[in-house]
Amino acid sequence: MKITILAVGSEAQYQPTFDTAYQYLKKETADLSAELSYAICRPEAAELFAALRTATGQSEAVVLLLSPEPAAVSTALRVVCSGLERTASVDAALQRQLETRAARMGLTLGYEQLPDLASFPAGAVPLPNEQGLVQGYAIPARRQLLLALPALPGELSAMFPSAV
């Protein structure tokens, strides 16, 4: 089995975070005897679309590790929806929860950022992140699996064993 991990976000800001998350996923998938590959993509639609297209052509599973920067989440959502020809829908209850959680964390998010954090592609299985703002989801497609997961290691390790 081949798994491609695409970390989405600023390499300058998040490379140590991505590296730690990759090592965690490598450990968690060791029982699968999977071959893992890993790349970092800027949150730019054309670059991510090309990387995702290549990865889906070469792997049984693709994992998008999403940095907490809003551009990473929104770009990944749009690219996944475009590539799979699906629409995104906002979970209004989750959006309210995330707004409250962000306030508790002392973060101010723009009104336009909250819907993307609470949106999922049609047909995706939500993978809740109870600790942070970046939510996960899984999309089984043909003989492949696409996962979008938070890149922050504490959030990833808290949700991965139970959700994935």
Regions inferred by a protein language model and the residue ranges of each:
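Short strand-loop junctions, especially beta-strand C-caps/beta-turns
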Residues: V8-E11, S67, A151
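Glycine-rich phosphate/diphosphate-binding loop of Rossmann-like nucleotide-binding domains
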Residues: M1-R42
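Generic alpha-helical propensity signal that fires on short helical segments
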Residues: A21-Q23, L52, V164
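Short beta-strand segments at enzyme active-site cores
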Residues: L36-A39, A61-L66
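Proline/glycine-rich low-complexity loops and linkers
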Residues: E47, A51, G57, A61-V63, ...
